[in-house]
């Protein structure tokens, strides 16, 4: 099973809490995280894009770096780990993304790929005057289908004359082209999102579900597997989890309860309000899960809380789910979390037994 790190491009990572670690996103922080991840044989690093945060006492995600420029910098200071940036497709023409991706492919020596997102939080785009109207919610995957076709044309042949409802290319050129086939990833959980990923993505991200229920996402992976089979393609699921680990189950649980007790209610109210704007995509979208009050303090990603051995066992259970090809991990404390994972958790995982033992890196 592949292991990735979801780097904290926004302040405070993925814990919407006054009692969680408070920090700003910087290049130096993300450089240290990704270099540690590479040292411990993580397979990939991904950054999201967020253009407006949730406010509240913690100013959650009000402070964010930009994904492509961050990952270009990280590509230059790593040598093995795969690097993925996220394109907010309403803000960037596909020909520009194609050229930026080709540039980072050159920087990384063929280790780069692109995560495509349609956009769900209206204020991110309204603040710039580029929100296309609420009808966009129902046609966003039509838009993204044309977008990815332009990308594939330009990466594949260096030229596009695509004509569609949203994009018109007139002998559009991009050169040099990527040195290796460019990976495209998505995070669809609605029926429309999964149908898009089945047709166009190399793999699909989905949320884990619940606390210490590592296989609860299995129905989502099964839906993705079924959708891919209809297209004759193999599109695996990569599952998002937060790891909160300690020497004992009790110590890890105490951390988790401490973070929940400090939940930033004002920021969570903003998330809930925004999640209700899309009335056209169904009840199974990522953003609806994010806002579920069950575990909104970490946007309801799957959460693995326990001793190092307990977390290792739960990750092996994830690996046993049909269609699950990888996990994307976040941590309450990223620098310590990546190191602890590499030294204390990964060596106990059967699905990572092929990874050589690694000692702590020398500063």
From Swiss-Prot:
Keywords: Flavoprotein, FMN, Monooxygenase, NADP, Oxidoreductase
Source domain of life: Bacteria
Protein name per Swiss-Prot or TrEMBL: Pyrimidine monooxygenase RutA
EC code(s) of this entry: 1.14.99.46
Function: The FMN-N(5)-oxide reacts spontaneously with NADH to produce FMN. Requires the flavin reductase RutF to regenerate FMN in vivo.
UniProt catalytic activity: uracil + FMNH2 + NADH + O2 = (Z)-3-ureidoacrylate + FMN + NAD(+) + H2O + H(+); thymine + FMNH2 + NADH + O2 = (Z)-2-methylureidoacrylate + FMN + NAD(+) + H2O + H(+)
Family membership: Belongs to the NtaA/SnaA/DszA monooxygenase family. RutA subfamily.
Provenance organism: Enterobacter sp. (strain 638)
Gene3D superfamilies found in the cross-reference section: Luciferase-like domain
GO biological process, one term: alkanesulfonate catabolic process
Any one Gene Ontology molecular-function term assigned to this protein's record: uracil oxygenase activity
PANTHER family found in the cross-reference section: ALKANESULFONATE MONOOXYGENASE, ALKANESULFONATE MONOOXYGENASE-RELATED
Transmembrane segments: none
Entries under InterPro entries matching the protein: Luciferase-like_dom, Luciferase-like_sf, Pyrimidine_monooxygenase_RutA, SsuD_RutA_monooxygenase
Residues where FMN binds: 49-50, 115, 124, 140-141, 190
